Amino acid sequence: MVKTKAVMAVGTSTVSNLSLPTPIDTAISKAFVTGRFLPQTHIRFQMVPADLCSKSMYLQKDVVVAFRQMKLAAASDGISLRIISGTRNFWEQQAIWERKWKANLAQFGATAKNAREILKYSSMPSSSRHHWGTDIDINNLSPGYFATGRGLKELQWLRKNAIKFGFVEVYSPRESGRITGYEPEAWHWSYSPLSTQYLSFYKQNIAYSDFKGFLGCEWAKDLRIIEDYVSVNLN
């Protein structure tokens, strides 16, 4: 487990219709919010039970509890929910980012345009909300899946009910007026009782000098990653 210094405390509150009190993380650190830790050895994390997910992954324990409650509620309404992606630390995100970076080199070169193309759906290492163990991808990663049929019903249920369990839709449709940040991701939901704490800490403590150690990191400031991608949502 990464040893962290207690640097931030947030007051308690409760999530609407959720029986558990809002978890408070009093040991948030720069290393944590930028993903430089191992979830499998972190005291707040656990492996997600197989009945909740499609593959082996880790999430924060509080997120697992809340998702199980949401999954059960959805099932009672005929809706099936399954986590298909959970925590990705810095090095996992780096692997995804650099694979795409190298694949785009022939077309875009080592340029900001290369980074911007990747940023449509993938975060720079050090800036992904998936670092925090609070954010999950549900059921399918295709925008078209949630536009019709079963996927649309699942999305409608989530938009109506997920907040009762602490989960919020992170990357809202462009029609909502959002012009910065990633493309809409109907599958991406965040456990806001914790993620709001990490987002607040991130905006107060992370600088562009913290973006290092991966291909294309030099473009983070020019592309306003902190302002236009990490900070694009309130939760």
Which positions does each model-derived feature cover?
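Extracytoplasmic cell-surface/polysaccharide-interacting catalytic and binding patches
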Residues: 2-86, 90-235
